[in-house]
Amino acid sequence: MKKIRIGSRDSKLAIIQSEMVMAAIREFDPDIELELITMKTTGDKILDKTLDKIGGKGLFVKELDYALYNNEVDITVHSYKDMPLEDNPKLPVVALSKREDPRDAFVLPQGEIAENNEPIGSSSQRRQLQLKALFPNRKTAPIRGNVQTRLKKLDSGEFSAIVLAAAGIKRLGLESRISRYFSVDEILPAASQGIIAVQGRAGENFDFLKLFHSEESLCISQAERTFVREMNGGCSTPIAAYATIVESEIILKGLYHNEATGESKKECVSGSRQNPVELGYELVKKMESCRRI
């Protein structure tokens, strides 16, 4: 009997997402034995600093990558938006989920209907930039931790509201906590937001993930991540990308903020869904004027 060991962060959301992958594997072949192996990543342990101060998104995958390299697990499961933008040829992304809700959500303290004077909590420069445009008279402040940790900070009075990815809240069954959804025009999402990624070792067989994988998610992620990567969009850079497929076309929207000049720019391009990477580069070219100092 074939056995597959699945590596995951140990947060409740990460485990739920891993269980979604496991359900698809069982549907493909009920005889495959599955083992879930959870671990804390460096990004989960260091919560008193923003990600750009401690090494970026790679801190959420480092321990899981080591487990793959050392053959302690066979695949690992991630929120794709939290993965580094540079591909690792030895540990490729081998499957992507269908995209769930890509929007960001506004969450108020439990029982709260009126605004208070505390800041709006947000984990990314991307969100903070767009929140300032939506709420020019409100302060924003960084917030770290898993969803439950952030909700506790919110409910204890540290923040007047927080902004989280809608997909994660829904997967946790906490949709009732959402006060409002921001449209993708109000807050443009992070590249690959709402998509779960599965990583494995190069050269191995991953047919067991056929029922999980979405070619549409691969297409839109290639466009979004190409744009963000080429614009040097790490955790400290306010940058966003969102692609949709309409019939045979991809529509790609992007946001870039030049911190040196203070200029922000939104642009949109469209093209054949057969060429998502090229479309990402096309959007980069449209942003060139904003990137110059």
Curated annotation (Swiss-Prot):
<dbReference type="InterPro" id="IPR022417">
    <property type="entry name" value="Porphobilin_deaminase_N"/>
</dbReference>
<feature type="modified residue" description="S-(dipyrrolylmethanemethyl)cysteine">
    <location>
        <position position="235"/>
    </location>
</feature>
<dbReference type="GO" id="GO:0004418">
    <property type="term" value="F:hydroxymethylbilane synthase activity"/>
</dbReference>
<protein>
    <recommendedName>
        <fullName>Porphobilinogen deaminase</fullName>
        <ecNumber>2.5.1.61</ecNumber>
    </recommendedName>
</protein>
<comment type="pathway">
    <text>Porphyrin-containing compound metabolism; protoporphyrin-IX biosynthesis; coproporphyrinogen-III from 5-aminolevulinate: step 2/4.</text>
</comment>
<keyword id="KW-0627">Porphyrin biosynthesis</keyword>
<comment type="subunit">
    <text>Monomer.</text>
</comment>
<dbReference type="InterPro" id="IPR022418">
    <property type="entry name" value="Porphobilinogen_deaminase_C"/>
</dbReference>
<dbReference type="Pfam" id="PF03900">
    <property type="entry name" value="Porphobil_deamC"/>
</dbReference>
<comment type="similarity">
    <text>Belongs to the HMBS family.</text>
</comment>
<dbReference type="Pfam" id="PF01379">
    <property type="entry name" value="Porphobil_deam"/>
</dbReference>
<comment type="function">
    <text>Tetrapolymerization of the monopyrrole PBG into the hydroxymethylbilane pre-uroporphyrinogen in several discrete steps.</text>
</comment>
<dbReference type="InterPro" id="IPR036803">
    <property type="entry name" value="Porphobilinogen_deaminase_C_sf"/>
</dbReference>
<keyword id="KW-0808">Transferase</keyword>
<dbReference type="GO" id="GO:0006782">
    <property type="term" value="P:protoporphyrinogen IX biosynthetic process"/>
</dbReference>
<dbReference type="InterPro" id="IPR000860">
    <property type="entry name" value="HemC"/>
</dbReference>
<dbReference type="GO" id="GO:0005737">
    <property type="term" value="C:cytoplasm"/>
</dbReference>
<dbReference type="InterPro" id="IPR022419">
    <property type="entry name" value="Porphobilin_deaminase_cofac_BS"/>
</dbReference>
